[in-house]
């Protein structure tokens, strides 16, 4: 099996002044903290020197980024050299002398000059913030440290920043490496696209030669085999394109995360930096997929079948395509694009399946409805986190190939691949379906296989206002469970598990579990079959309501 080359990121260029500076010039993401405008009314160097100060010490009136002494008056305000966190004042060298010479002021904490808005005080005690509490991940004043934070693990602000800068740098380097691996995988997928075409083409040539020997009696069987191969070719290409789309989406997410880390690294104010860092969401560890196409090896089996069967083809003409289908169903001759993921050893351990909501939340994922797939009768609200069936009122969505034309369905914008995932939805009204499907689901067809209950690559449960049923391959399975308004959906992609849970205040009740065979990225899928149906993607920070009677009511 060909494996993806793990490329360690090389030395990062362009980092000279600050260890957390951006990795290179980026006109889009490199947003200046302050905008400097030259003031045409600023005084000349000669006029400045006549006032007895060096031009470098004076703050030009139009230079907003310069921090001036608060004790200096008029136009001769001098640049500050220190800020006192006790006095909450900026001092120039001259006005700083009392702090240096008066022993009563030696206890005041002096820092590098800071803008007025950066001289942060404790909102509870109105005292300067002097320490960082590791226990509660926040900046605190001295009174906080002696009170509610007594006994907590605390360090100075400067020490806390140094520690966080090291962590931030590691995150940047780790993200750089993952981004390179992801881009490498995308490049391999592009190459594999050609490999699929070439490999299938080779089998077509063999089939053409052998069927030529059978003359007119073989023409119908020849056409059947060609259709068979083309279907498998299209299926393989669809898988490649689906995986490529997933990886490209991951690249975009990691680019956004990279820009956010660079923005955070550029913050000069220590307190603001620490506050922003504590809000920072850790980047999810992502397995680095390695792409292997075993198509040619598997097609050799088909080639052997075609060659060997030529001698007995007259007797096999009626069942030729059926015989090929039998080989296709066997793993040995399965004409598919096989994608293997190379996962770091620390992620290969088999973790037990979660049981409590807190355990499920370890795999929380933030999904939204994809407006480019929503049927025109579906209205998206709340930043694409709520969908409502507004039949017969249409919405002026653009006509796109990805939009569902007949079935009132919508997919998630995010694909699920290689990992475990958990999200929750809230149902309103009977006739709602929730599940998973693949990217290749037909968007324009009216047949049952175009909806998420009627094909072999979709799995869903249906709430009809009274009870739940499970659907797969157009087969319905009644479920004997209590009604629930909020559902938890758990996906274990490597394990081939899709589970639906009823979410209550103090319990997680299994509604149904599908054993699936995932071979490409999947998408959360939703079908609102009746008007005024609604589905809302729940913010996982919302605690479930305490149970009170029936949880779900049918729509009027």
UniProtKB/Swiss-Prot annotation:
It is found in: Cytoplasm. Residues 347-545 form the B30.2/SPRY domain. Residues 1-60 are annotated as: Disordered. Residues 33-56 have a biased composition (Basic and acidic residues). It is an enzyme of class 2 (transferase). One of its GO terms (molecular function) is zinc ion binding. A zinc finger (B box-type) spans 64-113, 117-156. InterPro entries: B30.2/SPRY (IPR001870), B30.2/SPRY_sf (IPR043136), Butyrophylin_SPRY (IPR003879), ConA-like_dom_sf (IPR013320), E3_ubiq-ligase_TRIM/RNF (IPR051051), PRY (IPR006574), SPRY_dom (IPR003877), Znf_B-box (IPR000315). It holds the Pfam family zf-B_box. Its main location: cytoplasm. Residues 163-266, 312-332 form a coiled coil. The modification Phosphoserine is found at residues 107, 195. GO terms for cellular component: cytoplasm. Its EC number is 2.3.2.27. Widely expressed. Expressed in basal keratinocytes. Phosphorylated by ULK1. It catalyses: S-ubiquitinyl-[E2 ubiquitin-conjugating enzyme]-L-cysteine + [acceptor protein]-L-lysine = [E2 ubiquitin-conjugating enzyme]-L-cysteine + N(6)-ubiquitinyl-[acceptor protein]-L-lysine. Keywords: Coiled coil, Cytoplasm, Metal-binding, Phosphoprotein, Repeat, Transferase, Ubl conjugation, Ubl conjugation pathway, Zinc, Zinc-finger. Belongs to the TRIM/RBCC family. Homodimerizes via its coiled-coil domain. Heterodimerizes with MID1, TRIM24 and PML. Interacts with Galectin-3/LGALS3 in a ULK1-dependent manner; this interaction mediates autophagy of damage endomembranes. Interacts with BECN1. Interacts with ATG16L1. Interacts with p62/SQSTM and LC3B/MAP1LC3B. E3 ubiquitin ligase that plays an essential role in the organization of autophagic response and ubiquitination upon lysosomal and phagosomal damages. Plays a role in the stress-induced biogenesis and degradation of protein aggresomes by regulating the p62-KEAP1-NRF2 signaling and particularly by modulating the ubiquitination levels and thus stability of NRF2. Acts as a scaffold protein and facilitates autophagic degradation of protein aggregates by interacting with p62/SQSTM, ATG16L1 and LC3B/MAP1LC3B. This is Tripartite motif-containing protein 16. It comes from Mus musculus (Mouse). The lineage of its organism: Eukaryota, Metazoa, Chordata, Craniata, Vertebrata.
């Amino acid at each position: 099996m060909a494996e993806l080359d793990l490329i360690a990121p090389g030395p990062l260029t362009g980092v000279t002044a600050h260890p957390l500076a951006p990795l290179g010039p980026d006109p889009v993401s490199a947003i200046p903290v302050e905008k400097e405008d030259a003031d045409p009314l600023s005084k000349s160097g000669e006029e400045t020197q006549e006032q007895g100060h060096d031009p470098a010490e004076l703050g030009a009136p139009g230079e907003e980024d310069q921090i001036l002494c608060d004790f200096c008056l008029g136009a001769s305000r001098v640049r500050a050299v220190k800020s006192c966190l006790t006095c909450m004042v900026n001092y120039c060298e001259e006005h700083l002398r009392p702090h240096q010479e008066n022993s009563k002021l030696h206890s005041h904490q002096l820092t590098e000059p800071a803008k007025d808005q950066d001289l942060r005080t404790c909102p509870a005690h109105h005292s300067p913030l002097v320490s960082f509490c590791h226990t509660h991940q926040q900046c605190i004043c001295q009174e906080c440290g002696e009170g509610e934070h007594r006994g907590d693990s605390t360090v100075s602000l400067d020490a806390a920043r140094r520690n966080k800068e090291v962590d931030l740098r590691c995150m940047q380097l780790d993200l750089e490496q993952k981004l390179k691996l992801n881009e490498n995988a995308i490049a391999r997928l592009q190459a594999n696209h050609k490999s699929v075409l070439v490999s299938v083409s080779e089998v077509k040539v063999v089939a053409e030669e052998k069927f030529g020997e059978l003359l007119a009696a073989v023409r119908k069987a020849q056409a059947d085999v060609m259709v068979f191969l083309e279907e498998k070719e299209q299926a393989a290409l669809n898988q490649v394109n689906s995986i490529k789309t997933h990886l490209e989406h991951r690249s975009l997410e990691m680019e956004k995360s990279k820009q956010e880390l660079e923005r955070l690294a550029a913050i000069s104010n220590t307190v603001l930096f620490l506050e922003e860092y504590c809000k920072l969401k850790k980047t999810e560890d992502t397995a680095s997929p390695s792409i292997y196409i075993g198509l040619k090896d598997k097609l050799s089996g088909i080639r052997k079948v075609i060659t060997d069967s030529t001698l007995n083809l007259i007797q096999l003409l009626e069942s030729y395509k059926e015989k090929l289908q039998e080989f296709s169903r066997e793993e040995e001759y399965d004409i598919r694009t096989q994608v293997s993921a190379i996962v770091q050893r620390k992620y290969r351990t088999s973790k037990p399946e979660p049981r409590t909501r807190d355990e499920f939340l370890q795999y929380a994922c933030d999904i939204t409805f994809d407006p480019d797939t929503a049927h025109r009768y579906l209205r998206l609200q709340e930043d694409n986190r709520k969908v409502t069936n507004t039949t017969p009122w249409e919405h002026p969505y653009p006509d796109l190939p990805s939009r569902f034309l007949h079935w009132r369905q919508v997919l998630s914008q995010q694909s699920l691949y290689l990992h475990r995932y958990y999200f929750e939805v809230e149902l309103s009204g009977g006739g709602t379906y929730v599940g998973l499907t693949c990217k290749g689901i037909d968007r324009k067809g009216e047949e049952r296989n175009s909806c998420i209950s009627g094909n072999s690559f979709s799995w869903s449960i249906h709430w009809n206002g009274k009870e739940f049923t499970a659907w797969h391959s157009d087969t319905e399975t009644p479920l004997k469970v209590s009604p629930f308004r909020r559902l938890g959906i758990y996906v274990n992609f490597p394990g081939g598990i899709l589970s639906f849970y009823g979410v209550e205040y103090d319990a997680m009740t299994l509604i149904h579990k599908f054993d699936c065979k995932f071979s490409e990225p999947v998408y959360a899928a939703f079908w609102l079959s009746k008007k005024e149906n609604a589905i809302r993607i729940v913010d996982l920070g919302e605690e479930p309501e305490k149970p009170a009677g029936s949880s779900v009511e049918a729509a009027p």
